[in-house]
Structures are given as structure tokens and as C-alpha cells.
Amino acid sequence: MIQAGLRIDVDTFRGTRDGVPRLLELLDEAGLKATFFFSVGPDNMGRHLWRLARPAFFWKMLRSRAASLYGWDILLAGTAWPGKPIGRELGPLMRRTQAAGHEVGLHAWDHHAWQTHAGVWSVQQLGEQIRRGSDCLADILGQPVRCSAAAGWRADGRVVEAKQPFGFRYNSDCRGRGAFRPRLADGSPGIPQVPVNLPTFDEVVGPGLPREAYNDFILERFAAGRDNVYTIHAEVEGLLLAPAFRELLRRAERRGIRFRPLGELLPDDPRSLPLAELVRGRLAGREGWLGVRQP
């Protein structure tokens, strides 16, 4: 049996409203549980269109055929009109996810703002964004938030420090191999991190890998004897690619891949996890910097 953590990022209003119910159906059909990370504040994701001036982002959007993949309502959200408040309007879907037995955590208050400004915000500004998102999601769920995942994996040592006061059991803020405890500025271990170590659809699909070949590509990258942490997006696998994701789940089962929530990948005693640094790095297929485990 190959154990794998399944992380579902929910970035937008439409992804929550339309993608989450579809994913809940598919996971129930497969008898699986996963971790959903919700964005709960305003949906301003359309403001990323201004990044088209950057060649790397323009190429990524062109390579993944973003307009057909996401839809124009997602690509324009929060541009010509105020972003819709996701948590306030769609909180019942987050409670439904929790009631179905899935792990629920915080992705962001404002996904666009975090992805755009996390690199320059102070620790205090980062903490305020985390507080707003955590308080909102806790009110929706009726219980404290126990895990989080930085939007766009935009995390570094400052983000690690900013999350310390919130009492999360773990965070999934970076890319890299194996769960670890990030080293804080004073040298002490921080809240455990569960990194993602498998590529996402939008990072690899393009002229060299057509959509139809993606399932073959990704399934070959799961391996026994290590942590396998895979991320999908409600806006992608919960909408246009839902049929392909259903087929992926069926094929994964036949290969002995068993998906579970990320929290179940942690040892009973987190003190057994190795210490490592969480630093800024680069990853093929993604525009800009992101958090990576080192070493």
C-alpha cells in the first residue's frame, strides 16, 4: 500500500460553490477523506491578470490554457467589481465538508493579497491576515482551526514565525521532501510542516504534456516508503477536470495508492521529526518564489 496525503486548495468563490460539492461527491464515491484548505475572505483572484506582464506568468497561463481551464468568472473576479466574501456567503459548504469527515484548514483570508504581498509584509501584517482568516473559519466551523496552508506556497521564515501563536497542529506551507519542524529564529523547532512533493496539474501540463496524459504522468510519481503529498484545486479538478480526477482516483486504488488527510501523515510524537529550514526558492512550472524545505 502506498500512503498519500491529498490536499485540496480552494482559492475562489466559484471553486467553493461549484467545485467543492463535486469533489465531496467524488471522494465519497471512492470512500476517501482529504484535507480541504479554504480561502474565506474576498475573492480578488482576477487581479492576478496584471501579472500577465511578467513573461513567466504569461507563459504559465498560455501553457495551461487558463481561460478554458478556470473560466472567465474566476479569471476576472475582483477586478471590475468588489470580490465576493467567500466565507460569509458559502460557510455552509465548509461546514458540510467538515461534517463529511474531511480535515478542514485555512488557506488564506485574501488569496490574491497573500500571494502578491506576503514577501514584503511585516510579521505583524502577516499575522493580521492569518488572524482574520482563522477567526472567520473558526466562526464558520464552530471550533478552532487546526491546520493551514499558505496561498501559493508563499512562505519563508517570517511566515513560520507569524503562524506560531495560532496553535495550529501543523502547516503545509512549502514544497519539499518529508514532514519536518522548521527552525525558528531563536533556533527552537516550530510547528510541524507537511510539504507537498508532487507537481500540480498547472505546473506540468503544456505542449510537452497534454491534458490527456496527465494522469499517467502523476501516478508514476507516487512511491512506496516515503511521504507522497499531492495537491489538487477545487477550481480545476472540481470543475472542468472532475471526470479526469474521478478516473485518477480509480486508477490510484488499483495501484495501491491510498489517499488520506495530511494530518494523518504526522507521527504521534512530532518531536521525532527532523529540523530543517523553510526558505524561499524556485520551482519549474511556477512563476515567482515559493517556500521550500532546506535541506
Swiss-Prot record:
Residue ranges occupied by any NodB homology domain in the UniProt entry: 2-260
According to its UniProt entry, one GO biological process term is: lipid A biosynthetic process
Please name the Pfam families in this protein's record: Polysacc_deac_1 (PF01522)
Q: Name one GO cellular component term.
A: membrane
Which key words are in the record? Answer: Antibiotic resistance, Hydrolase, Lipid A biosynthesis, Lipid biosynthesis, Lipid metabolism, Lipopolysaccharide biosynthesis
- What family is this? Belongs to the polysaccharide deacetylase family. ArnD deformylase subfamily.
What this chain does, per the entry, is described as: Catalyzes the deformylation of 4-deoxy-4-formamido-L-arabinose-phosphoundecaprenol to 4-amino-4-deoxy-L-arabinose-phosphoundecaprenol. The modified arabinose is attached to lipid A and is required for resistance to polymyxin and cationic antimicrobial peptides.
Q: What is this protein called?
A: Probable 4-deoxy-4-formamido-L-arabinose-phosphoundecaprenol deformylase ArnD
Question: What gene makes this protein?
Answer: arnD
